[in-house]
Amino acid sequence: MKLNSVKKVYLLGGGGTLLGFAKELRTRQYEVVVFTSPRHSREIMPGGVTLARELDSQGIPWHMPEDVNTNAVFLDGITPRTMGLGFGEVWTFNREIIDLFDGKLFDFMGIPLPKYRGGAHYTWQILRKSRLGACNIQVINEFMVQGEFDSGEIVFAREFSYPDTARIPRDYFDAAHKEEVAFLREFMDRAENGQDFTLSPVPEQYSMYFPRLNTVRQGWINWSWSTLDLELFINAFDDPYAGASTELDGQVVRLKRVRTETLDGPFHPFMTGLVYRVNSTGVYAASLQGSLVVGCVLDEHGADITATICTGQRFFTPMERLEAAMTFHAQYDAKGAKT
């Protein structure tokens, strides 16, 4: 497959990597058009403003169709020299759309395919202590369902490792962004130089699927877990997400910026969640093998209440909260989370 005839690029979806690639393509003199969704358009970019505002400030044309399969602007703009590349787009493409691109409709996948299919990739990876990252350009076929299933051939791929300092999703996002933009530059360099890309099948025997998550509904802390598992779980729902949830005196609170210490432990199971020390380094809560040192406690509305926490209080999650979290199935559409 050669792509050196491409002059126009449709970017579909959202995220910082899409924005970075759009800017890169503009410097290479490509015609760039972005097709996004309401939830993607509201995403905050590295500069602190929304994707929509960033695109406007860069003079990059963008559209927000309900369904690209029936959108006249999308359909009428496709030419034999148009390439499409998705970044978490919300649409599934029909056979007619795929044929219009003549094999040049792709998806960018920032995961080590076929592992971590689904959603909430970094949360799942943090829970499993996985530091393997990857970038893939994958052919979109009619069987692809965004966030559920993909089987198209791999056009171009690279693997990398997340640094040992990466602890929370924000760390993974930041590290991945640099790798992804560099990967896409290399992809375009090779395409412009006339490389004949070889399509490779996805090795399905290694497939792993983990579903999308809803932090508020599913990120509830089970204080019976080991100290390490508590740390991993709370880190996995840290920035840019709302934080892992529990209760304090019957009120919902969310924890962030945690670390563990073993100097004071272990603790009896009856002691888990008890706040036994508060000082300038954090709120110390007992857990089975040691201390969970919490750097930030937020109320349900996101206000920092760390300074109000006192010794003798207990973080506790009722069983009904835990059962609801384990049985909830997160679903998203173009507007955001479905309730």
Model-inferred region functions:
Residues Y10-L18:
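Glycine-rich adenosine-cofactor-binding loop
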Residues H40-D56:
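N-terminal beta-loop-helix "entrance" segment that forms/cooperates
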Residues R212-W225:
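Acyl-group handling in specialized metabolite and lipid biosynthesis
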Residues P61-V68:
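Short acidic-hydrophobic, aromatic-tinged amphipathic segments that line or gate anion-handling sites
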Residues V32-H40:
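Short internal beta-strands
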Residues K8, E24, G88-M208:
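Donor/substrate-binding cores of folate-linked one-carbon enzymes
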Residues N69-P80:
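Short amphipathic alpha-helix with an adjacent loop that forms part of the alpha/beta core around
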Residues N222-T339:
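An anion-binding loop in the catalytic cleft
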